[in-house]
């Protein structure tokens, strides 16, 4: 990183509201003059990555998250396969992006989603409208209805690739990964039901797979304190806290880098 000629890639994991920590980390990187030449993101990482690649500052990204009332009654649906209609969030993004495509972004971005029918990971091409790619990537299964693009149904990119480090392999000289989905802190008393044990087992399974990808990064920013927050935080105070946690973890890990 001391060599300014090095191209830098940034990978942003999924994580719901905890993705606000991505913005905090980007704030620190920006202050250090570290600018990515490419970005890859899924789910919450796709939202933050898309906004940043478009030109929004980390503080503006935080304010964007705070402006959305996720559980507004207008967002609920009874006709689609989800508690909330993913299409209902289009207006929030349209005010910012309009009809721009991924290829028109200031920073090249790679956004992923899961093709529910084919069961394959989709990396959207440069001609895809940014709004469509982001909404498809962040359609959390069960909570948000699948998002349709050209008669194909897509759901959260994190289903198949929660931390898409592999997408930027060979596309940059130095890779920074920001991972905002640490394992939740629990105690034995929290594992008293079939549901809780099953959920914990899958959390550990996915975590093991994602942690292996840390080896593909030159620098990993993982705010473990985020384990104390839920995936769907609605408190603006907690959103501010998550932003600060991301910033502080980036700062601490930067000081400990062996470069």
Range-by-range predicted roles:
Residues 1-42, 50-259:
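Patatin-like phospholipase
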